[in-house]
Amino acid sequence: MPFVRIDALRADAERLDALGRAVHDALVETIGFPPNDRFQVLTSHDGTSGMLRYDDYLGVPRDDGIVYVALTMRSGRTPAQKQALYRRIAELAEEYAGTEPRNVVITLTENGSADWSFGHGVAQYVEG
């Protein structure tokens, strides 16, 4: 189960939906998550009351098309799987939402089975 947060600057509902689909499709294609395993928070920031900050870190020029993708999932993926995931997210974000790959910033945080509850106050992966 991935938990996905996507933050974009001045994105309308259509663009947010396209970004959410891009990330979900990439997770299904590269990591093998089930298609019905979707937990996402999609947020647009207007640039006034909500902002995104960025610079040209590591020589990557970014602009107001910036998108932050924060993924949380159970541990167990190889570096090669993660690289394939990042690449596919960037490709699909461009295809679905017109977001340039240089503007897609991704973080992936891993944790353990006891760190998830899908409702009822139960850690389903632990109690099985």
Regions found by a protein language model. Name each.
Residues 1-128:
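Interaction-mediating elements
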